[in-house]
């Protein structure tokens, strides 16, 4: 079964995440574990590793690290992605999320809806960038990419 069965966020930031960021993280992990599609392609003439997988996301030396293990915790892969392609979309996503959280407190539903539509658009762009960067390393569907992008944002800013 090619899916993620466990996810861990290796967060080494000395600053604890805000309540909103922690909530986003918990929801993304719950949704991701409920439904996801994650497969590793065949590489270097070897058959692809079979899931379910345990995934640890981390930032090390300025790179996004995917540490992938079997359900029995045997290492089946690790790859590193440059954070460069994510920087602007992560920054935009956090700015729009801040606006959204503030809007929910004081604006009418029509204005909240407009901000939420913009937030979803930026989130979709982040998922697209992630799918593109994962090409040849891991195969994910768009919903899995969206949830992983949320976790990357939390890791990046949390």
Swiss-Prot record:
Disulfide bonds: none annotated. Transmembrane segments: none annotated. It comes from the Bacteria. InterPro entries: UCP032146 (IPR008321). Belongs to the UPF0262 family. This is UPF0262 protein RSKD131_1985. The lineage of its organism: Bacteria, Pseudomonadati, Pseudomonadota, Alphaproteobacteria, Rhodobacterales.
């Amino acid at each position: 079964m090619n899916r993620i069965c466990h996810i861990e966020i290796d967060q080494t930031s000395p600053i604890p995440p805000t309540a909103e960021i922690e909530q986003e993280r918990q929801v993304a992990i719950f949704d991701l574990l409920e439904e996801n599609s994650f497969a590793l392609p065949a590489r270097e003439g070897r058959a692809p590793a079979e899931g379910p997988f345990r995934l640890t996301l981390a930032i090390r030396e300025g790179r996004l690290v995917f540490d992938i293990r079997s359900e029995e915790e045997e290492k089946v892969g690790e790859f590193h992605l440059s954070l460069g392609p994510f920087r602007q979309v992560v920054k935009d996503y956090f700015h729009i999320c801040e606006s959204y959280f503030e809007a929910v407190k004081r604006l009418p539903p029509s204005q909240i809806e407009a901000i939420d539509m913009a937030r979803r658009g930026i989130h979709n762009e982040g998922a697209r960038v992630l799918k593109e960067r994962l090409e040849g390393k891991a195969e994910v569907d768009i919903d899995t990419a969206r949830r992983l992008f949320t976790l990357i944002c939390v890791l990046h800013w949390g």
